[in-house]
Amino acid sequence: MDSLTIKNGMLLSPANGFDGEKGDVLLRDGKIAEVGGCIEPQGEVIDATGCYVTPGFIDIHTHCYPAVPLGIDPDVLGIQRGTTTILDAGSAGADNFMDFYEGTIKHAKTKVFSMLNIAAEGLIRGHELNDMAKIDVDACKACVNAHRDVIVGLKARASASVVGDLGIKPIALAAETAHELGVPLMVHVGNYPPALGDVIDVLDHGDIITHTFHGKPGGVLNADGTPIEQAVRGRARGVRFDVGHGVESFAFETYKRALAAGFDCDSISTDLHVENYQGPVFDLATTVTKLIACGEPLADAITKVTSVPALFFGLDGLGQLAPGMTGDINVFRYDDVDVTLQDATCATVEVRHHVNVRKTIWSRGSQTHILEHPDTPWDPKAVSAEELAARIAEAKKEN
């Protein structure tokens, strides 16, 4: 459709001054044309009474390259789950990026950006950084420079099972390469070595630690619950700390302790892939719901899946309800519920409010589309403890 008017919603886009006040949004030719009070309807009309209206959600950590073992179709992880833009976190490297781009990215309804793996083969085989010969810096730079409209960062995994005996060496090279290219480096952290502090120390402004609140030994918190000194120094120079829930990388206890210590996340992401999109992660809205249950304010959580990731990766036209921005919008209810959700350690949290996406509005070119999500009572069907334990045991081999 060419025009769409969303009426009577609670506009929530804190980055540009909308904090839940009632208002309307007009979309025309794939862009937001007007935001504010009572707007004269044009084209199709959505009555958003009782719902929040936000910029389209952005998930900065997914795996949507189907050629790798963890990969799954981007639209399954994106618009079908209420997220209009996703970033693939290192599934492809310089050797296979063009296959990912031509075979998947170009055909997706969901907006897809890539963080190129510093390892040339990406995540085709795992253990991708246990040999420096697996890194081709020149090919990496050439690939990024040829596709800067899609490749918005680099990715490296800093786990013992990935780097082997090389420790910090491949991560330091990834950071050096990203800094020379002028793009962020996202680093997966998990079981050490290398030590988390050593990883943070090679990062600079704009780089991102994902899986920050994993709960494994050697994590972001000291025994007394305070953040480690390297994390404090890193944040001071602009290193960002992301959630990256995943199948083994988010613990309610760790996050709550960090929140109490004043060390909140900078961004919220899922690490969605084939092993967790049916639980315990499900989707970005569910991950947001979990953080809210742990104490994150709604407005802050929405900012961390809209304007913040857009700023981190320079995603022009995304992340705000403002004239001229791309017409990607979420309409969600903030339902009162009484359910229990699991983290990646089988621990649970009582959920009282659910971010329940009702409509995902996405625009490509001059056309705007609406995906309505089933209006059924929310039932997350948490994965059984036995099944989750089996998944975690398998994930430990790679994390």
Model-identified regions with their sequence ranges:
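Active-site metal-binding motif and surrounding structural segment of the metallo-beta-lactamase
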Residues: 38-53
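His/Asp/Glu-enriched, well-ordered alpha-helical/loop segment
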Residues: 253-334
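Active-site core of metal-dependent hydrolases
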Residues: 156-278
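Di-metal (Zn2+ and/or Mg2+/Mn2+) metal-binding site signature of metallo-dependent hydrolases
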Residues: 51-73
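N-terminal metal-binding scaffold of metallo-dependent hydrolase/deaminase domains
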Residues: 1-40
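Divalent-metal coordination cores built from histidine and acidic residues
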Residues: 76-159
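Divalent metal-coordination and catalytic microenvironments
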Residues: 9, 25, 30, 50, ...
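C-terminal cap of metal-dependent C-N hydrolases
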Residues: 326-379
